[in-house]
Amino acid sequence: MILLKLYLTLAAILCQSRGTTSLDLDDLMTTNPEIQNEIINKHNDLRRTVDPPAKNMLKMSWDNIIAESAKRAALRCNQNEHTPVSGRTIGGVVCGENYFMSSNPRTWSFGIQSWFDERNYFKFGFGPTRAGVMVGHYTQKERCRPEV
């Protein structure tokens, strides 16, 4: 079986300040293979639970080039302005960009779960279930695309 590779969407952007929590920012560094696995596993675990189930949901995997692009966006950390498409096109593929902001450090799983929880306000084939709710983080994470 051929393992399909889905480039990690630029969904891994945490803009945080140091808080009073016991979680240290060093514990969240994406250079740590354990953190990379946490991010990928959380995405893949949640993507398997979408309803209705996807017929061709690709498995996400870590990509260092895309991670570096996400890092550059996080260093800019402007929640009001996403990176221009030209700045997040990698290998001819336009990557999405989700932000998670917190006043204190949170785990990657917490941030990814918060994006996924937008599913409560989204109905497949219809869209947002009411005006003014945020669903774009969820729909971007769960959207399937052809092989790269």
Curated annotation (Swiss-Prot):
Keyword Disulfide bond attributed: yes
Domain (SCP) ranges: 41-140
Location within or outside the cell: Secreted
Keywords: Calcium channel impairing toxin, Disulfide bond, Ion channel impairing toxin, Neurotoxin, Potassium channel impairing toxin, Secreted, Signal, Toxin
Pfam families, sorted: CAP
Transmembrane segments: none
PTM per Swiss-Prot/TrEMBL: Contains 8 disulfide bonds.
Single annotated GO MF: toxin activity
Domain of life of the source: Eukaryota
Cited InterPro entries: CAP_dom, CAP_sf, CRISP-related
Tissue spec: Expressed by the venom gland.
SMART domains in UniProt: SCP (SM00198)
Signal peptide coordinates: 1-22
SUPFAM superfamilies linked to this entry: PR-1-like
GO cellular component: extracellular region
Similarity section: Belongs to the CRISP family.
Protein task: Blocks ryanodine receptors, and potassium channels.
Name by which UniProt lists this protein: Cysteine-rich venom protein VAR6
The organism of origin for this protein: Varanus acanthurus
Taxonomy of the source species: Eukaryota, Metazoa, Chordata, Craniata, Vertebrata
